[in-house]
Amino acid sequence: FFYDTEFIAEGSTIELVSIGIVAEDGREFYAVSTEFNASNANEWVRENVLSKLPRASHPAWKPLQQIRDEAHAFLTAGRGKPELWAWVGAYDHVVFAQLWGDMAGLPKDLPRYTRELKQYWQMAGRPRLPKVPDGNHDALVDARHNLRKFRVCMEALPLDASGAASR
């Protein structure tokens, strides 16, 4: 699964704004939290993230508990244990895991880490990536772009089912 989050990090907390998750089979999940405090957002987040969110009446707006439950169901609907990939995903994984409280609350059927797509791209020899799409910094747009970047990297440096380079 390829994902992205948008969040507000004001120095002592990280608040989820939105999350987009894309499966290799084309399924998608998108949600916007009803619980973030927009007044904590810096100018960059207001201009580049909050301005792109759907209207508050859109069904993507959900409480964190609903986002947590729906994201878990989405990620575990298929066969096997899910694998998460993100581009510079350290904060993404923290804000994702915080949906369950602390790291100990993360369900056992979800990964304890996110695979780093930017590092994979570097190891694959920095192949030419797809153009950054219009609407970037929308979590779902960025998650879709992460899948496209992964496919480019797989052509340059294929991985086997265990995640090892297969050349």
State where each predicted segment sits:
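Conserved non-catalytic scaffold segment of RNase H-like nuclease domains
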Residues: F1-W87, P133
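Hydrophobic positions within alpha-helical membrane elements
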Residues: A9-G11, W121, L147
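Intrinsically disordered, low-complexity terminal extensions
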Residues: E35-N37, W44-V45, E70-T76, Q98, ...
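Amphipathic alpha-helical interface surfaces
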Residues: P63, I67-F74, D92-L99, E116
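Acidic, Mg2+-coordinating catalytic module of metal-dependent nucleases/exonucleases
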Residues: E83-G89, V95, R128-R167
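Substrate-recognition/cap helix-loop segment adjacent to the acidic, metal-dependent catalytic center
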Residues: A90-P111
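Short, flexible loop segments at boundaries between secondary-structure elements
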Residues: K108-R128
